[in-house]
Amino acid sequence: APVADVATLADVTAECEVVSITAPTATDNCGGAITGTTDATFPITAQGTTLVTWTYDDGNGNPSTQTQNVIIDDVTAPVADVATLADVTAECEVASITAPTATDNCGGAITGTTDATFPITAQGTTLVTWTYDDGNGNPSTQTQNVIIDDVTAPVADVATLADVTA
């Protein structure tokens, strides 16, 4: 049976995907150098460790195998598409806000989520926190001010006031 040229294959690591691996080799006493083959499906994108099995076949019914770890470990949080979110200002209430977005190195576009309760009606500034979650344990956050500032004085409806006589 072929003997692997390297006793232990090095782990292959990446944040998002591994699209291919250089095939290892083995040596056979009759056939010389043999390149390993695998039935692994590429790209490998699943977070965590995937075990790839390499098979060395000398063509004479004497195969041998060797395994290699492929480790996908996304450690990069999404980056907000806009560095600072614009303030949202209203006189009475803000019923909703268009969710901002971020870009993730593995997942692409991520839409922010918030646990803020809408409508926001409290006078003054309310800080809304947006969370961008890439699904791989790397959240990032961004804040946005919602400012409720009632600057319009009430106007009396004089058409409905009755005359008062004494």
Stretches with model-predicted labels:
Residues 1-166:
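Proline-threonine-serine-rich low-complexity tracts
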